[in-house]
């Protein structure tokens, strides 16, 4: 009985200890976790209060770049692809047959009209000239003798010693001799001309190309192979095409130029449209439209004194047909495309942005004409547009200067000093530098 009683008491003690341990663990978990949660909540609350009080002060304004809409005189240009052609092109060939004795030009050389280019062996033509001159001397002597005989016959005819028939025959001999002398003179002139043709000269001023025949070859007149080709490049022409819808504007520009005794300006630009090569004027317009392409050909002339234009070169021709007065102009970067059409972001005195729908006109890679929706003097955003919403306030910054770009270390120092001296983050940052990202510590 006693042993059983002891076992029962030990069991109760063991159960009591286990229950006490369980109660202690549950109590610790309950009360300890609640305290931690309260502490964490308090910290988060405090952090939230700090954020609520200081977050607005630390949030940076969106940096943008801006420009002011201005009134300008804007020229209207029509652009078409063109080809440079020589004002005149001459294929130099020989007019006489013979051996090519000499070439008196350098390939690619600029020559003037009348300059000696080549020589054909002149000896055969010198011989022909000598023969013609000898024949002339012979026939001239015959003519002189016939004229003296005619004078004697005329005297004898008066005395009746010769018949009238003999007198007429002598007169015919004189006329025949006169004809022979004239023929001989023609032969001499022909021989002299052939001798002149043996010296080949430049018919026009221009640039000679590559020689097509070498010295020593026998050349015949009328051969298909030329000696050289000369292209006149001072001046030079550009033939370009424009759509037929542009014809009225071109005709009107010509009429306006005629009234003021002026010219219609034309510019030649390179194939990338980045560099202007030369300035000239409209020379002529073709008299019919190409029905295949719906375009019309135009020809412009350029002095080309600096030889920037070369025959068969492709260029972009820009013809000025009008000049808009008091046009409102903004940078091209300011105009955006939306579902409602073109628009710009404008800035008020407080640097708050507002969206304005606009109608655009003439534009190029740098500026665009605003036909409606904007007035001169209004400021528009040109950079940082992707961060804008209606009515938001922004910070207008200026582009980074060349000195800042050249010295990155000084730029970073200046930016750091500016950030430390202003309540708005990022105010000392260069205009085209990216906005500083918020770290995890700042977020918490």
UniProtKB/Swiss-Prot annotation:
Any one Gene Ontology MF annotation carried by this entry is:
efflux transmembrane transporter activity
This one is known as: Multidrug resistance protein MdtA
Signal sequence, start to end: 1-20
Q: Which InterPro entries match?
A: CusB_D23, Multidrug-R_MdtA, RND_pump_MFP
Q: Show the ranges annotated as biased composition (Low complexity).
A: 406-419
Feature: compositional bias, Polar residues: 37-52, 435-444
What are the boundaries of the region Disordered?
37-60, 398-444
How is this protein situated with respect to the membrane? Answer: Peripheral membrane protein
Location(s), subcellular? Cell inner membrane
Which species expresses this protein natively?
Yersinia pestis (strain Pestoides F)
Alphabetized UniProt keyword annotations: Cell inner membrane, Cell membrane, Membrane, Repeat, Signal, Transport
How it assembles, according to the record, is:
Part of a tripartite efflux system composed of MdtA, MdtB and MdtC.
Q: Name one GO cellular component term.
A: efflux pump complex
- Quote the PANTHER family the UniProt record gives: MULTIDRUG RESISTANCE PROTEIN MDTA
Pfam families hit by this protein: HlyD_D23 (PF16576)
């Amino acid at each position: 009985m006693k042993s059983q009683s002891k076992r029962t008491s030990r069991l109760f003690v063991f159960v009591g200890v286990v229950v006490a341990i369980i109660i202690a663990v549950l109590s610790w978990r309950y009360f300890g976790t609640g305290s931690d949660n309260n502490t964490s909540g308090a910290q988060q609350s405090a952090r939230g209060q700090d954020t609520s009080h200081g977050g607005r002060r630390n949030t940076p304004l969106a940096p943008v770049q801006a420009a002011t809409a201005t009134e300008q005189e804007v020229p209207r240009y029509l652009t078409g692809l063109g080809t440079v052609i020589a004002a005149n092109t001459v294929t130099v060939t020989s007019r006489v047959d013979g051996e090519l004795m000499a070439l008196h030009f350098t390939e690619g050389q600029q020559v003037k009209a009348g300059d000696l280019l080549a020589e054909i062996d002149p000896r055969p033509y010198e011989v022909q000239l000598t023969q013609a001159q000898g024949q002339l001397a012979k026939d001239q002597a015959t003519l002189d003798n016939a004229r003296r005989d005619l004078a004697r016959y005329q005297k004898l005819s008066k005395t009746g010693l010769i018949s009238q028939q003999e007198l007429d025959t002598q007169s015919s001999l004189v006329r025949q001799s006169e004809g022979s002398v004239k023929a001989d003179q023609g032969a001499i002139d022909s021989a002299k001309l052939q001798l002149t043709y043996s010296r080949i000269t430049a018919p026009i001023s221009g640039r000679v190309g590559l020689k097509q025949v070498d010295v020593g070859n026998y050349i015949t007149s009328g051969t298909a192979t030329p000696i050289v080709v000369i292209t006149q490049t001072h001046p030079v022409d550009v033939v370009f095409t424009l759509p037929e819808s542009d014809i009225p504007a071109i005709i009107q520009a010509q009429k306006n130029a005629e009234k003021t005794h002026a010219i219609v300006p034309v510019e030649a630009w390179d194939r990338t449209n980045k560099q202007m090569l030369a300035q000239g004027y409209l020379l002529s317009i073709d008299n019919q439209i190409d029905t295949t392409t719906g375009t019309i050909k135009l020809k412009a002339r350029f002095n080309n004194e600096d030889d920037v234009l070369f025959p068969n070169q492709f260029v972009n021709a820009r013809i000025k047909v009008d000049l808009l007065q008091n046009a409102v102009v903004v940078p091209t970067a300011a105009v955006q495309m939306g579902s409602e059409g073109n628009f710009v972001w404008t800035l008020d005195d407080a640097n708050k942005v507002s969206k304005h729908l606009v109608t655009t006109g003439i534009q190029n890679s740098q500026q665009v004409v605003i036909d409606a929706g904007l007035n001169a003097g209004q400021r528009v955003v040109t950079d940082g547009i992707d961060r804008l919403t209606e009515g938001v306030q922004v910070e207008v910054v200026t582009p980074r200067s060349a000195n800042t770009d050249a010295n990155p270390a000084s730029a970073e120092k200046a930016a750091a000093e500016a950030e430390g001296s202003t309540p708005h983050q990022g105010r000392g940052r260069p205009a085209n530098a990216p906005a500083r990202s918020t770290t995890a510590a700042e977020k918490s």
